[in-house]
Amino acid sequence: ALTALSSDLITEYKKDKESRADWEKGYTSGLDLLGFKYNDEGQPFKGASGVTHPLLSEAVTQFQAQAYKELLPPDGPVRTQVVGEASKPKQEQAGRVKEFMNYMLMDKMEEYTPEFDQLLFYLPLAGSAFKKIYYDEIKQRAVSKFVPAEDLVVPYYASDLLDCERITHIIK
């Protein structure tokens, strides 16, 4: 039974990977054009210059900086809003939730900020980026990890992660 299950899993993973082959090719070609990877093959003739313009790299860095400033302000990313009657006890509770969540994200979860920063640099390059948030039994707390789009394999035409048949996270 386990052999059949693993065989099915590998077969379906290969189908999902193949369904996004055009996206992967476009993504790696785009990185090459940005100058993130040197490759001689794309030169029009032997000895041609491989110079790329830094404008796109600068745009990526500007996006990262702006998004970081907006999404991770100095007082933390969590905001709360009271739903329904905004009584004093509810407002105080909302304040405590905000304070605790920001404390967890900015102080206890030491990986949160660098992983989020990496995600923001990657996002404009790939067009998609993901965060995997899970409870770590060893650390006894939630952990938030950046998952690059090339490491998250789903059927290419899936409209959202909640309804897709499979989600495969390639862990390197």
Describe these PLM feature segments.
Residues 1-172:
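Extended, helix-rich architectural segments
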